[in-house]
């Protein structure tokens, strides 16, 4: 059986961690792309030298040439710049839209049949732009956000309740930002809903509210602690979980920023936004789940925030 090929566009902290995890999970050969001369090659060589130690036997190469993405099965995109002090939202959008244009064209010309995962922020609009420029079909492109946000929600709940995180199932929907919607109705601990835990007095409502708030600002909390840079271990782990579900046809249902069709969740237009999504060898399939009236209202607020970003991006493109 031919080995799978995984292309990682962006060789920064997330890209390097993605490469290491892909090797450890033996998902396939890895191509690490970056525009910085020498940097992806150095990281690739370092990673390649872990293979004898880890007991894996895969190829890793670094490159500055999009041609090396040819025939990739999966492309994970982390390229872009983070928001810096003094930078407006439109400044960040303008820069990263240009990055997505370059990356999208690289995908279109070299691996148009790849399954594409976008991690670049602001996520919901970047995955939209990446599809626009790459031409990848709706079912073959998705944004990584909900898996990470849900992992943060699960972590905080497990810590609060002093239980194994493996016993906590919790989900987050909506845009990847302050308006995300942690689903307290369908989230549970060993099958017991959070609502039931609150009723039984095992989880105070004010503590649950605080956890929801902390989940929404989870990325910012890490940025504040690091002072330079942002999270990369958990984002990379989330991206690899999604890639593995595609490569191994696991059919996992994960919260992701997929292209949701008009009519689902009350949408009046097709939109990339975080919803439960099945990821299989056929690509992605958004799934509509039952949520409470309050959660539906919150989701609409989040959808409107994503639409506002789309409008801002359209204005930038029109200039």
From Swiss-Prot:
InterPro entries in UniProt: L-lactate/malate_DH, Lactate/malate_DH_C, Lactate/malate_DH_N, Lactate_DH/Glyco_Ohase_4_C, Malate_DH_type3, NAD(P)-bd_dom_sf
Residues holding substrate: 83, 89, 121, 152
Molecular-function GO term, any one: L-lactate dehydrogenase activity
Matching Pfam families: Ldh_1_C (PF02866), Ldh_1_N (PF00056)
Keyword Flavoprotein annotated: no
Keyword annotations: NAD, Oxidoreductase, Tricarboxylic acid cycle
Enzyme type, top EC level: oxidoreductase
Catalyzed reactions per annotation: (S)-malate + NAD(+) = oxaloacetate + NADH + H(+)
Record: residues binding NAD(+): 10-15, 34, 96, 119-121
Active site: residue positions: 176 (proton acceptor)
EC identifiers of the protein: 1.1.1.37
Known role: Catalyzes the reversible oxidation of malate to oxaloacetate.
PANTHER family xrefs: L-2-HYDROXYCARBOXYLATE DEHYDROGENASE (NAD(P)(+)) (PTHR43128), L-LACTATE DEHYDROGENASE (PTHR43128:SF16)
Record-stated family: Belongs to the LDH/MDH superfamily. MDH type 3 family.
Protein name (database record): Malate dehydrogenase
């Amino acid at each position: 059986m031919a080995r799978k090929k995984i292309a990682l566009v962006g060789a920064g902290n997330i890209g390097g961690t993605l490469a290491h995890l892909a090797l450890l999970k033996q998902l396939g050969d890895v191509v690490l792309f970056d525009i910085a001369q020498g940097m992806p090659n150095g990281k690739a060589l370092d990673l390649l030298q872990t293979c004898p130690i880890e007991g894996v036997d895969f190829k890793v190469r670094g490159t500055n040439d999009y041609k090396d993405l040819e025939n990739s099965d999966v492309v994970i995109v982390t390229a872009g710049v983070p928001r810096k002090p003094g930078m407006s939202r439109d400044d960040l959008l303008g820069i990263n839209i240009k990055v997505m244009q370059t990356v999208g064209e690289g995908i279109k010309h070299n691996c148009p049949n790849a399954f594409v995962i976008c991690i670049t922020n602001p996520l919901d609009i970047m995955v939209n732009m990446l599809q626009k420029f790459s031409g990848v079909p709706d079912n073959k492109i998705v944004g990584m956000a909900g898996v990470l946000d849900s992992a943060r929600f699960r972590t905080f709940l497990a810590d609060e309740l002093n239980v194994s995180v493996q016993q906590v199932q919790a989900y987050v929907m909506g845009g990847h930002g302050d308006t995300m919607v942690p689903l307290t109705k369908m989230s549970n601990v060993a099958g017991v809903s959070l609502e039931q835990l609150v009723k039984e007095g095992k989880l105070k409502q004010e503590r649950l509210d605080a956890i929801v708030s902390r989940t929404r600002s989870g990325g910012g909390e890490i940025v504040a602690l690091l002072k330079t840079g942002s999270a990369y271990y958990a984002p990379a782990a989330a991206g690899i979980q999604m890639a593995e579900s595609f490569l191994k046809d696991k059919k996992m249902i994960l919260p992701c920023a997929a292209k949701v069709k008009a009519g689902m969740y009350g949408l009046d237009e097709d939109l990339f936004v975080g919803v439960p999504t099945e990821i299989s060898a056929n690509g992605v399939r958004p799934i509509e789940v039952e949520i409470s009236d309050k959660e539906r209202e919150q989701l609409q607020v989040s959808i409107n925030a994503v639409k506002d970003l789309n409008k801002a991006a359209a204005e930038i493109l029109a200039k």
